[in-house]
Amino acid sequence: MRRREALRQAQRWVIKVGSALITDDGRGLAHEQMSAWADQVAALRKAGRQVTLVSSGAVAEGMQRLGWRSRPRALYQLQAAAGVGQSGLVHAWSDGLARHRLQTAQVLLTHDDLSDRRRYLNARSALREMLRLGVVPVVNENDTVVTDEIRFGDNDTLAALVANLVEAEALVVLTDQPGLMDRDPREHPDAVLLDEVRAGDPELERLCGSPAGVLGRGGMLTKVRGAERAARSGTYTVVASGREGRVIQRLADAEPGLGTLFVPDQEPLAARKQWLASHLQTRGALSLDEGAARALRESGKSLLPVGVVAVEGGFSRGEMVVCRDPAGIEVARGLVNYAAEEARLICGRASRDIETTLGYVDEPELIHRDNMVVTV
């Protein structure tokens, strides 16, 4: 089966629509364009596919309603604009899809919702039930309550995490660019569109020369990283131009040469591992010797204190930490069994020495393999 045929077979879709495609050049939402997008989403639903929308545009709509001509930089001003614009954004999607007798649901998420196991499972169950009922969820970051430390950062990342959450087979990221080019098209007019790439190819990041737009936070780099993240649940990602006519239907028909297809190049992670991988913020880092790093990379074994040479940061038991090899490269991340001060006391020691060092022993491992995801 040609790899684009995976799109024809995909039953569960996440579609991310960028700000440039649904705003009137910064003057609020472009309702005619949104209505046209709703028509395409409705056609996909009519074909029996489940669809989740991740939609930008709340800040741009809020700026219009507040009379602001330039995007603010202060977080509290962005939050105010998002709060004002969010209702208009969801209302516009609701109106467009209601013409096709489709129900929508507003879903606002924060990183904390996905890093807490119970809330993560609740969000997953709610979204899956909406999809089962034929509802089109419209997902966005809950900008009015997040801080810089706990924000997703951009809707490309959020879309990938939602794809993981609902175990989508296809993620479509619609932008104002044709896809990923082999060179920066601003500097090389003869740059060629890449038709198909491996989602985890480390060479892709160097091709991302385009910055984010004025109204959006994401550039091509966030889309490449989002595709890699989505691939953890086996999701195929397409980055394509929303300026193309009937682009969603054409992608669903597996049309070749439309956008860039990011192909998953590893086995999908188990559900719990996907949750672990969804943590964007970490509380500290463990520096490993070569033997421990190799054991994690090649065998996915638990991390024992003896393989740790240094502890960075201040973290509590059960928080997420990064594991780095001697070159400083992340090899894994996981939920640690000991607080930072305890970890500093037992690092480099055999597990049998934990009790004599601390006066007690909680676990023989610093991080158990079930609470760890290898990231290389």
UniProtKB/Swiss-Prot annotation:
GO MF term (any one): glutamate 5-kinase activity
Pathway stated in the Swiss-Prot or TrEMBL entry: Amino-acid biosynthesis; L-proline biosynthesis; L-glutamate 5-semialdehyde from L-glutamate: step 1/2
Subcellular location: Cytoplasm
Annotated substrate binding sites: S56, D143, N155
Pfam families assigned: AA_kinase (PF00696), PUA (PF01472)
Any single biological process term in GO: L-proline biosynthetic process
PROSITE patterns associated with the record: PUA
UniProt catalytic activity: L-glutamate + ATP = L-glutamyl 5-phosphate + ADP
Residues that coordinate or bind ATP: K16, T175, D176
InterPro entries cross-referenced by the UniProt entry: AceGlu_kinase-like_sf, Asp/Glu/Uridylate_kinase, G5K_ProB, Glu/AcGlu_kinase, Glu_5kinase, Glu_5kinase/COase_Synthase, PUA, PUA-like_sf
Keywords for this protein: Amino-acid biosynthesis, ATP-binding, Cytoplasm, Kinase, Nucleotide-binding, Proline biosynthesis, Transferase
Occurrences of domain PUA (ranges): 283-361
NCBIfam families with a match to the protein in the record: proB (TIGR01027)
Family: Belongs to the glutamate 5-kinase family.
Protein name: Glutamate 5-kinase
